[in-house]
């Protein structure tokens, strides 16, 4: 079963922005957070919120931003709209991702290929009353800064013309911060910024309990508490652990037990390592990898590790490892609770 956990204020505020008119600042949103914190899920929720308001959702792709929007995504949205009776046209929610076989090309002698802003204006002209266009972009830190400027400039111009258009993007914190230093991203610096954080223990307990209950599996309070502690509020791990715990208890047809939790934990942590940690460590320099290994050695039983303890484990002074520590923070592989 699917149960969304955590605070829904982000989605509610965004929905209020869609109702607020073209000048509402909540219509431009940047979501950031570390790997596995739920940024893509948050974007999906924003898309669903827009669809519930009758808006069209256009998903932009980070590695090739403008051309697919103009050649594929917007034409596909227009084709979907034009299939409806103009007099009775009402959008219940259209999402176009740009991944597929729909595209348009100009035949010889045709007018020049349309621009992004021209294509968006054409789409807005076709919209029924009280509808609009939401453009979403995941992994924004991977986008070419010049193309991002083209997109945000188009959104800004359309908003100035009173068009109902919104933009929501998600990315890693330091990557987003670096991107916003680019001179072409002034518009995004004024966007609403939401930083996703780990779920609270209470939220973790609730989502594990409610998800299992929807599938007919009971997780006793003691098991819930230990499971929540293991996840540390990390959404990817909550989902992964919850899935394995639910599956094992469901097979037995009995409430989940501490034995179930102990049995699934090794596989859960291995999967976490394979899917999240291993790709992130693949090309890591030896000094940074050694720092992480030392940190893991001394962290057991602690939420955070003093830099001095890591330096001691490495046989070095704090000043000698400070640059390595900063590089790992920049890579979003570790974080400082005091930052």
Question: What does each model-identified segment do?
Answer:
Residues 1-27, 73-76, 83, 92, ...:
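A short, basic N-terminal segment
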Residues 25-45:
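Walker A/P-loop nucleotide-binding motif
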Residues 52, 56-57, 64-101:
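Conserved NTP-binding/hydrolysis module of P-loop NTPases
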Residues 20, 176-229, 241, 250-255:
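Helix-loop-helix "sensor" segment of P-loop NTPases
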Residues 146, 314-330:
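Short amphipathic alpha-helical interaction segments
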Residues 233, 239-318, 337:
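Winged-helix-like regulatory helical subdomains adjacent to P-loop NTPase cores
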Residues 329-339:
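A short, conserved structural fragment
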Residues 107-173, 181-184:
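Conserved Walker B catalytic segment
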């Amino acid at each position: 079963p699917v149960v969304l956990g955590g605070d829904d204020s982000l989605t509610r505020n965004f929905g209020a922005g869609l109702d607020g008119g073209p000048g509402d600042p909540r219509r431009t949103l940047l979501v950031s957070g570390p790997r596995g914190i739920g940024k893509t899920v948050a974007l999906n929720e924003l898309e669903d919120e827009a669809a519930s308001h009758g808006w069209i959702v256009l998903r932009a792709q980070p590695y090739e931003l403008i051309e697919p929007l103009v050649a594929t995504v917007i034409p596909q949205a227009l084709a979907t709209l034009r299939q409806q009776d103009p007099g009775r046209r009402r959008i219940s929610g259209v999402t176009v991702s740009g991944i597929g076989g729909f595209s348009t090309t100009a035949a010889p002698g045709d007018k020049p290929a349309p621009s992004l802003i021209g294509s968006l204006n054409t789409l807005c002209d076709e919209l029924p009353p009280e509808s609009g266009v939401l453009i979403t972009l995941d992994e924004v830190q991977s986008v070419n800064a010049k193309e991002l400027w083209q997109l945000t400039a188009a959104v800004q111009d359309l908003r100035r013309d009173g068009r109902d258009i919104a933009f929501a993007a998600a990315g890693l914190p330091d990557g987003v911060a670096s991107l916003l230093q680019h001179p072409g991203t002034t518009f995004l610096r004024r966007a609403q910024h939401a930083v996703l954080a780990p779920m609270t223990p209470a939220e973790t307990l609730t989502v594990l309990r409610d998800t299992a209950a929807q599938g007919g599996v009971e997780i006793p309070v003691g098991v819930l508490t230990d499971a929540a502690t293991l996840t540390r509020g990390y959404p990817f791990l909550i989902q992964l652990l919850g899935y394995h715990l639910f599956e094992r208890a469901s097979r037995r047809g009995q409430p989940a037990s501490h034995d179930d939790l102990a049995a699934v934990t090794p596989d859960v942590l291995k999967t976490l390592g394979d899917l999240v940690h291993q790709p992130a460590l693949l090309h890591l320099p030896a000094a940074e990898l050694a720092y992480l290994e030392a940190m893991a050695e001394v962290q057991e039983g602690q939420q955070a590790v003093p830099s001095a303890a890591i330096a001691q484990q490495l046989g070095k002074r704090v000043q000698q490892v400070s640059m390595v520590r900063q590089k790992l923070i920049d890579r979003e592989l570790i974080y400082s609770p005091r930052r």
